[in-house]
């Protein structure tokens, strides 16, 4: 049998040896270039392959068509993956007639995902094992070929368990590889109801929470000890890594984290205590617990805990700079941040009509100004604040053809200055991209990470807005890669609600669709349906959209860093015509209905006559919100009818007030 192997780490080496011992012809080994930032404590798959005369490769993207074709030319019967760190595409899996097989370090379906050896120790499991399973595009989900269990003892650490699992991998494969070669192996589907999934671990996950019980802390320490970065805690600003410890049931009536003895060095937990056997001060030597206490001058009553500066930073209210605070997104976001009470807002806009109620708030500092003029004020406040939201843009479709250069100057050039200032002062920017960047994409749902961004020809000037935003997205992404700019791009999909533009802006034709339609009802003029209103959009309630944006600002666990997030409601898809009909229905039922003229009907209008030359429309715009679900734990629930009702109510009451 001929195989192509994807392998890394000690377990990868053990697996390659098992294949060779079984007489499998290995056409090539794909592995990884060792990361200089990683503690490379493990054996080299590349060296093992080279010593056995096996061609070895380490491509950046093994799923690239060039590599797929190269693998196809090798004509493997089977594909094996042994602790290879990248997913293989379906194209690669389809090459091998006998299929693909992956070795996973747990008893599947438990502990699918990353770092299972560390996770089972963290969670205090008493058993783990090795599983060989068929490969599917979904990670660790294929049918089980063979499985061996392994008991976990209190003496196990990440190092010892990894060594034992490496040995187990060899034993398992020595039994099952001959069966695969002979075609006599069996398959058992996984019970998905018992599946659990765990993500990657980072060094930051090793911070000790002393409010846990001693057993939980002991499990963390042994799960991330050498050769991994280690569990750690702080004494003020002094970081201490704890390499070895035991759990004691003895409980002390003190605050968790308090040093209660120095010989042996003992720290109180919420329940029980931890006896430290070995540790290391930052930039210090690996020492016994007792010597560590002596050399760091530790005494009873001192307390381990979070880094002092981090505690201060966590309690300090973050400063947020909002440019365009009087706009639709800006005024709703301002209210949400002030209601939370953890943010201090600095804001600029050319008017304060929508935020007057906040002007006296002690945490709201507003300046009336123009971002094209007040460059020094803006740069000073970017330097002063923690988070920057540049919400100033021309975002009404008629302006794209009426004033294309003005759209470019404001939406791109002025915002580029802000982006560069964020790079200069190392500030986090949350940038409003737009659903318009997807243009005429034909995907059923627009995906932030995979959907193509397709715009029309140059003579269709309506695309200048989309292109300006897309280019800024690309510039921000490049700054993130090159200069470590902290950023999140969010893409609104037809956010709708009270204070979306104004009736006055609708009177001059510079508003979004629903506000324009409400003006028609208020003034008794026909509702204009551009090209019959057949274009479909996914309407999103502003309250839910702002909640998603608020969670982006919160950025729990840094999950939003470097991400693009669609914020929209895919289940609220409707044509402009249906939206208009719903609006008219709500209008006729409204308590203020008798204050306004009779409904004047619908007027079907060609887009060119309404928008002018250079316009081109999009027939559907439906977002994928997988990133919002995963990163923000956000999913919209408010239906379009309710949003239309709330929006209409606001503008009708506003119109009545204006006539008094």
From Swiss-Prot:
Entry GO CC: membrane
Source organism superkingdom: Bacteria
Family matches, as SUPFAM superfamilies: FMT C-terminal domain-like, Formyltransferase, NAD(P)-binding Rossmann-fold domains
Site feature (Raises pKa of active site His) residues: 140
Binding site for NAD(+): 349, 370-371
Catalytic reaction list: UDP-alpha-D-glucuronate + NAD(+) = UDP-beta-L-threo-pentopyranos-4-ulose + CO2 + NADH; UDP-4-amino-4-deoxy-beta-L-arabinose + (6R)-10-formyltetrahydrofolate = UDP-4-deoxy-4-formamido-beta-L-arabinose + (6S)-5,6,7,8-tetrahydrofolate + H(+)
Pathway: Nucleotide-sugar biosynthesis; UDP-4-deoxy-4-formamido-beta-L-arabinose biosynthesis; UDP-4-deoxy-4-formamido-beta-L-arabinose from UDP-alpha-D-glucuronate: step 1/3; Nucleotide-sugar biosynthesis; UDP-4-deoxy-4-formamido-beta-L-arabinose biosynthesis; UDP-4-deoxy-4-formamido-beta-L-arabinose from UDP-alpha-D-glucuronate: step 3/3; Bacterial outer membrane biogenesis; lipopolysaccharide biosynthesis
Binding annotation for (6R)-10-formyltetrahydrofolate: 114, 136-140
EC numbers, comma separated: 2.1.2.13, 1.1.1.305
Keyword Lipid metabolism: yes
Site positions per UniProt: Transition state stabilizer: 102
Any one GO molecular-function label of the UniProt entry: UDP-glucuronate dehydrogenase activity
Family: In the N-terminal section; belongs to the Fmt family. UDP-L-Ara4N formyltransferase subfamily.
Subunit structure: Homohexamer, formed by a dimer of trimers.
Name of the molecule in the record: Bifunctional polymyxin resistance protein ArnA
Species, as recorded: Shewanella sediminis (strain HAW-EB3)
